[in-house]
Amino acid sequence: MSDIISAVDAMEVLDSRGNPTVRVFVTLDNGTTCAASVPSGASTGENEAIELRDGDASRYLGKGVLKAVDNVKNIIAPAVIGKKITHQAAIDNLMIELDGTETKSSLGANAILGVSMAVARAGARSSRLPLYQYLGGPGARRIPVPAMNIINGGEHADNSVDIQEFMAVPVGAPSFGEGLRYIAETFHNLKKILKSRGLATSVGDEGGFAPNLESNEAAMDIIIEAIEASGYTPGKDIAFALDSAASSFSPDLCGSYDLKWSGGGKKDSADMIAMAQKWIEKYPIVSWEDPLAENDWAGFQKLTAAVGDKIDVVGDDLFVTNTKYIARGIEEKSANSVLIKLNQIGTVTESIDAVRMCREAGWRYFISHRSGETEDTFLADFAVAMDGGQLKTGSASRSERIAKYNRLLEIERELGANALYYW
């Protein structure tokens, strides 16, 4: 099969929030075309790669991406046409050079990532391999344990809960398919419980419920009820993962906090660490993402020293999938796990580099979607390719989330007895 890029095109499509995003098409000289669509985040770290928006208030409230589309067509395409499709790193590095900025603000990370993902997909097609094996090699066979978002708060919902995501993690399941069943059943039983108490069963951006609860702890209490109502044991069969997205309630993004949604009041780093320790003792928490704000490096270091032997302390906004910040975290022991988001850094190659750095340090890593997703299932293959064993891609509702789960079910079926699954 031919492996030379003959055309690159792009268009504006909508993500799961109804906002524009970029879809890129890469065509090989035998006529094969592969496409990829770029996700978008709501709670974003200040050091993330920049998605380019038009700022034209007359279109999509200023959120159009025609500039990014134009950059794909008129700047990136001429540079990559004629390149060998399997030279992923070379193509990604070429786009980084074309952009010339640290945060990809010139061409836009949404333009660059769209091309990077489409190139990877076309490379897999050209190599006659599934995407997960093309990116991860023939040994890629570990299906990630899903962390299903079942209660939303913070920036992802309009309610009285500060913590952005309360996730159910099927740590005791024997396979991905069974694990997905465990947490889907828990999701549906949670809906029944909420309904029986007159609480809202509307969902947030990632498909989790967004009820008005009296406290953050009330959210975990009701999830435990749902786990038990499903016939499972909290901690043994299903554990918790949390994402505080603490920068969203930190006025200075460093050591001060205001639990404004729940009315929990003002806190400092020491208060937040004490709260985390209390919750870890009380609830079956195995992973906690961004428990502190993105510039509270000292707080992260203290928290990791206190609880890092019990749970994964996951840096998201802290590291933004960037090896520069991950290296600092490893040096300072500011966490023990990294959230990997393709659009935080802007290329497939740099995302793989971030994973490689985690592996070399003995750190865990968690592959993640964004709150503004599309029907593209690239993330599912990428998670298997990276062999990290952990994935967050939303709830058991909203088809842009379900698409990733269904792709993982397909991969598990393809691998058969060779598939691995463990926390």
Curated annotation (Swiss-Prot):
Q: Name one GO cellular component term.
A: phosphopyruvate hydratase complex
Q: Binding of (2R)-2-phosphoglycerate: at which residues?
A: 164, 341, 370-371, 392
Predominant place of localization: cytoplasm
Give the record's keywords alphabetically.
Answer: Cytoplasm, Glycolysis, Lyase, Magnesium, Metal-binding, Secreted
Its recorded reaction(s) are: (2R)-2-phosphoglycerate = phosphoenolpyruvate + H2O
Q: Where does Mg(2+) bind?
A: 243, 289, 316
What are the positions of the active site? 206, 341
The entry's free-text remark on the cofactor is: Binds a second Mg(2+) ion via substrate during catalysis.
Q: Which cofactor does it need?
A: Mg(2+)
Specify the enzyme's EC class, one word. Answer: lyase
Gene Ontology BP terms: glycolytic process
Pathway(s) of this molecule: Carbohydrate degradation; glycolysis; pyruvate from D-glyceraldehyde 3-phosphate: step 4/5
Origin: domain of life = Bacteria
Q: Does the keyword Magnesium apply?
A: yes
Q: Among its keywords, does the record have Coiled coil?
A: no
GO molecular function list: magnesium ion binding; phosphopyruvate hydratase activity
List the EC numbers from the record: 4.2.1.11
The entry's localization annotation reads:
Cytoplasm; Secreted; Cell surface
Homology family: Belongs to the enolase family.
User: What function is annotated for this protein?
Assistant: Catalyzes the reversible conversion of 2-phosphoglycerate (2-PG) into phosphoenolpyruvate (PEP). It is essential for the degradation of carbohydrates via glycolysis.
UniProt protein name: Enolase
Q: Which organism does this record belong to?
A: Desulfotalea psychrophila (strain LSv54 / DSM 12343)
Q: What is the lineage of its organism?
A: Bacteria, Pseudomonadati, Thermodesulfobacteriota, Desulfobulbia, Desulfobulbales
